[in-house]
Amino acid sequence: SIGNNTNEVYESLLQGKSGITKNEDMASYGFRSQVAGSIKLDVSEHVEKRTLRFMGPGAAYAHIAMDQAIKDAGLTEKEISHTRTGLVAGSGGPSTSAMLTAHQIVLKNLSPKRIGPFAVPKCMSSTISANLATAYKIKGINYSITSACSTSLHCMGNAVDQILLNKQDIMFAGGGEELDWTLSCLFLSLIHISEPTRPLR
């Protein structure tokens, strides 16, 4: 990636830095494309353990971004948890790594009993909005929009509409996605990219 906060991203953009590097996991699984914008971040250092139990990596990244946004905006707890404060945030899909784990549990035990309740919020298509709204006690509108690679942009546009229509005063908007080989195999299994800094056209 090109940074884990606004300052790091800003500096990387000024320097023309590329965040695309070789991904060893993708190489070990035999992907023809073995490059990615890997995120160098230990989410457990930024999200409480109790909260993290319900999240896949994508939701955790969104949680960290929302925390940073709140601090940047100087919002109070009363302003965040208010009926005039809402949230529209999504992802292209659920946590595919969590879905694979659940599948492996069923295959191993020939039963879904050991999957556990924490898999539910990880595997919902609304995992981002559900996790963020719960963690930050959002009382206004709260839902996800899923539209593949345009998800975050559509969420932000929809959030602006809520303010323009005078339905909300403050909106949290955007999205989050996990970077895992289980997600990559759905669309990168046949694409070949070998040069990290050279985009596919």
Label every model-predicted segment.
Residues 167-171:
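Short, high-confidence coil segments that cap the C-terminus of an alpha-helix
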Residues 155:
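Active-site histidine-anchored catalytic micro-motif
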Residues 191-201:
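Single conserved hydrophobic/aromatic residue that forms the stacking wall/gate
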Residues 8-9, 14-147, 176-184:
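Conserved beta-ketoacyl condensing-enzyme motif
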Residues 137, 164-165:
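Residue-level signal for alpha-helix termini/capping positions
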